[in-house]
Design a protein with these regions (language model features):
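Catalytic domains of carbohydrate-active enzymes, especially glycoside hydrolases
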Residues: 26-52, 154-157, 249-256, 318-325, ...
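Conserved beta-strand positions
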Residues: 14-15, 40, 45, 162, ...
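Short, acidic/polar
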Residues: 20-37, 139-153, 235-249, 311-319, ...
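An active-site-proximal structural segment forming one wall of the substrate-binding cleft
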Residues: 33, 37, 79, 131-167, ...
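Active-site-adjacent "subsite" loops/lids of carbohydrate-active enzymes
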Residues: 3, 8, 22, 89, ...
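Mature N-terminal, pre-catalytic/accessory segment of carbohydrate-active enzymes
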Residues: 1-94, 212-215, 220, 365-369, ...
Length: 555
């Protein structure tokens, strides 16, 4: 079988072009540097959207003011191919110059009061304002984005990447009309009151329309589509801006792509887990039938400090995980090599890519083999947060148990084939079809591990009379919660139980988990010891640290 170029091992370097550097850019020299010094085999360059990097004929497609008549897109594509590089064209229709807003205000995102949403304001220097565009508006659709993609695809580009692709909260007339048609009600002022699927419906619909235009013209050119591994940093953003459901990616993209930035400028306490880039790559392998995901790693320390780069060993560690977990690597630099303020990163990118180049044959056609499936349910995470999911990852990694992710939408006999055990980390929303597949899996001897609210609701969020897998686990749901269990414990009732192997001589395990009460046919190995004090009073004095209720029998 012939491997398409985007399924082979990739060493992508993105040059995030700054418009002021346009006169300094010699495409042939830049491509030589990327190929010979940084050992890239594919490049990402700006093409259109916020700025046109070629002589566009599309009305309201804002030209790069430093272009001075050049066709930088054409020059760059030709230079890339001369040096044996694949060329991925980057576009961004998420925002546009204020001069366009003044001509076509209906294309832009609005507050409930009808005001536009400025992006990146204030920005020092001689810059005009940028306004967020409406996902459902003409700028992101047939009036600008579609004809711009047609222009870009007239060049011999090898791939397409839409930066900033997301749903933007908007109360414009078009969004109000579509919402009314979809749900028979008015669009609420409060985004928290939007229907659950509104952001996703808007985002996916927009992406599918653009993909149809591109695929009709150049079916050989892959579209890179975003997915995310939810974490605490991204969860609130994804709730309001569309989940980018991995299961929907196949309807508008050919290659899964993610961006697990190591954001040092957020501070140590807000830093992402050390395994985040690797697990992002691993999730990507589950998205589009095993197509290797492309994982974007920013060389900078965060958007606040685009012109300083990550420490060498920090960056190498973040990169290494991507490759180790089956992903293709994409480095992002701010500017071309000759305009780098922090040039230390160039040696790191070059040496790391050279290592991958030497071992390219070993990295080709890899498969992820693991006995354990961890179910990823984006809808459940949206409802309950990512804590159970992230905690499951942490536990399996710490115990060095190999696992693969399985999308909730792939909970079928075929999807479960090859696994010995399936872990459901609070997969609250579970369809009847998925439940039946899990029951058959268990009947064949497969192991099931489920936590908290797994199976409490159907796939639409309707609460079930009993949790979907209650019969398999031998429990009945009492239907109410014990929350705020800080300063509580789990009492060890059966130290010989397999779940507690190696726990040692202790009666208590620390606990602060919310509890969904159940009753069961079998004795629980752990039961609740309720809090001995409120969180405010737990620390002092030690003379009052005794536990008033030693045993409840609550599992």
């Amino acid at each position: 079988m012939t491997t398409r170029w985007w399924q082979a091992p990739l060493r992508i370097v993105q040059v995030n072009l700054q418009v002021v550097d346009t006169p300094l850019l010699d495409p042939d020299e830049v491509m030589r540097q990327l190929r010979e010094e940084l050992h890239a085999n594919a490049v990402v360059f700006n093409a259109g959207g916020i700025y046109a990097f070629y002589p566009t004929q599309v009305p309201h497609h804002f030209p790069n003011p430093y272009l001075e008549g050049r066709d930088l897109l054409g020059e760059s594509v030709e230079a890339a191919h001369r040096h044996g590089l694949k060329y991925i064209a980057r576009v961004d229709f998420s925002k546009a110059d204020d001069s366009i807003f003044h001509q076509r205000p209906e294309w832009f995102a609005k507050t409930p009061e009808g005001q536009p949403l400025a992006v990146g304001e204030p920005r020092y220097g001689p810059w005009s304002l940028l306004y967020a565009t409406c996902t459902n508006g003409g700028y992101c659709g047939e009036d600008v984005a579609h004809p711009v993609m047609e222009e870009i695809l007239s060049y011999d580009v090898d791939g397409l990447f839409y930066n900033g692709a997301s749903y933007r909260v908007c109360h414009c007339g078009e969004c109000r009309r579509r919402y009314r048609e979809a749900y028979g009600e008015e669009l609420p002022d409060d985004p928290g009151q939007f229907r659950d699927d509104w952001a996703q419906r808007s985002f996916v619909g927009n992406m599918q329309a653009i993909h149809r235009v591109c695929h009709a013209l150049r079916p050989d050119v892959p579209w890179l589509g975003h997915y995310w591994l939810p974490d605490r940093m991204m969860h609130s953003v994804l709730r309001s801006h569309g989940l980018r459901l991995p299961a929907a990616l196949g309807t508008y993209a050919d290659v899964p792509c993610s961006e697990p930035a190591d954001i040092l400028n957020a501070g140590y306490l807000e830093k992402r887990p050390s395994w985040y880039s690797g697990m992002t790559a691993r999730l990507g392998r589950a998205v589009l039938g095993g197509v290797p995901p492309i994982v974007i790693i920013h060389a900078c320390t965060g958007m606040s400090w685009r012109h300083t780069t990550l420490p060498e060993h920090e960056y190498r560690y973040w990169l290494s995980q991507v490759v180790a977990h089956g992903g293709n690597l994409w480095h992002t630099l701010t500017g071309i090599p000759n305009t780098q303020y922090d040039r230390r990163i160039l040696d790191v990118v070059g040496s790391f890519n050279a290592l991958l180049e030497r071992h390219e044959a070993l990295l080709a056609d890899t498969e992820l083999v693991a006995p354990v499936a961890v179910v990823f349910s984006a809808q459940s995470i949206r409802e309950t947060g990512p804590e159970e999911f992230l905690g499951t990852i942490e536990a399996l990694l710490n115990h060095q148990i190999p696992f693969a992710f399985l999308l909730a939408e792939h909970l079928t006999d075929e999807g479960l084939a090859g696994f010995d055990t399936c872990v459901l980390p609070s997969v609250r929303l579970l369809s009847d079809e998925a439940t039946a597949a899990l029951q058959r899996f268990a009947a064949r001897g497969g192991g099931l591990v489920a936590s908290f609210e797994t199976g409490l609701c159907d796939e639409c969020g309707g609460v079930r009379p009993a949790p979907a897998l209650a019969d398999l686990f031998g429990v009945q749901c009492a239907g109410h919660y014990l929350r705020g269990q800080s300063s509580s414990y789990m009492r060890v009732e059966d130290p010989e139980h397999p779940l507690l192997a190696g726990i040692g001589p202790t009666q208590h395990i620390a606990n602060q988990l919310d509890l969904l009460q159940v009753t069961g046919a079998h004795p629980a190995p752990l039961t609740l010891v309720p809090p001995f004090a409120t969180p405010q009073a737990a620390g002092s004095p030690p003379e009052r640290a005794s536990i008033p209720t030693q045993r409840t029998g609550i599992p």
